[in-house]
Amino acid sequence: MSALRDLRELVARLEQAGRLRRVSVPVSRDLEITEITDRVSKGPSERNVALLFERVEGSDMPVLVNAFGAADRLALALGVGTLDELGERVAKLLDVKLPGTFAERLRKLGTLFDLVKAGPRRVTDAPCQEVVETERPSLASLPVLRCWPKDGGRYITLPCVFTRDPRTGTRNVGMYRLQVFDDRTLGMHWQTHKGGAEHERLTNEFTGTEPHRTSSTPPTVGAGPGDPAKVMPVAIALGGDPALIYAASAPLPPSVDEVVFAGWLRGSGVEMVACRTIDLEAPAQAEIVLEGYVDPRERRLEGPFGDHTGYYSLAREYPVFHLTAITRRARPIYPTTIVGRPPEEDYWLGKATERLFVPIVRLLLPEVVDINMPAEGVFHNLVIVSIKKRYPGHARKVMTALWGMGLMMLAKTIVVVSEHVNVHDLSEVAWRATGNIDPKRDLLLLEGPMDDLDHAALRHRFGGKLGIDATEKGALDDVAQAWPEEIVMSDEIRELVTRRWKDYGL
């Protein structure tokens, strides 16, 4: 399946496949689009389609939502037949001998992605700069949604946010919600564990500044790596290459450039163009690019926001993005997503990441058979892992190793089952997890980093974690009684009943 170049090709491909519906009646961007999308995304699979709202009140831009909101649509957007193909491609890429330590392997992983020659292609003439607004750019021109009744404002929810390490120039592309404060400023909700926040911390260290709530007159935007200016340039791309949109959402290792990774996914380099008012590059095929800067000394109260947990995340202080320019296509499509109680569109983006990273986890933990992060666990609350158990404490070893692996450190509950268990069958997992554990022996309780959005944590970003060893116990575990044999019908009788099934009249 060929890679898609931009959002327009995705719309055309989805419409051709019968997986997109155009809504031609007027709709409000205040709550109405959310309710429509929520019903569609949680409805029967045949009615769960991408939506293109052509007449959004207060704007002449059509709004695209739920484009990635099902496994088949996301696979189409990424140029694969199924999401499992992502993992298969990574497994082939990693079918080489890597060095021994965890840190060395992650560094080598970045090199492997570079070796596929998927680096960005620089262009000077870009669709995202058909219209350039630098005199009086205004966020009011965008049909930004208010999604839920108690949201603190309107939010941009599907951005690719480009930042740079001020020392090395290393790029990061992340996806963070952006609250519209006014026509020229946004709340930059990059959480403390994310790449954008790390670049902000590095900017503080590099410039010797400390954050505070209120900023003075906006300073000049830094010109590049090594520049002593006290702010960091930021570019925000809306739309563009679907592979890059996905890559921005994925928790990639620091050594992997999201733009290169997207190029590897799509089989050719992503086209990038120099921004007009800041020294960063943006994807040439984007619909809209917001150029500006974040002053690490400035904070403003951001939120609340109806989040993917199904609850409102609390209002907290976050950095502020200042707009210096808007560049866009002549007739742009505004892409957005709705987050809320799962399953929503973001669940499928997370599912793609799960499938993609299984072979990477196996590279470091060869005993892992499969992983499932079900919708009910909203990514970080529940991770189910099947393993080839070989020695006492093996399940605990896997739990602690996973908690030490990048953003998996935020996982609240890890359930480990035996290799023959289908981790995607929640009924089977629950049956085995409740039947195979002795709470005194098989539960591991500890404390560690938690997701910013975890409202039940002991304190913000830190709390308890639970590991459950739901594997069968036997001689390896020195149990006091014999482990019972599982009830299974004989193959002979199963084959007999299969042959005679029509005879029974059932």
What are these language model-derived features?
Residues 1-208, 227-506:
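Extended, highly charged
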Residues 207-228:
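Intrinsic disorder/low-complexity segments
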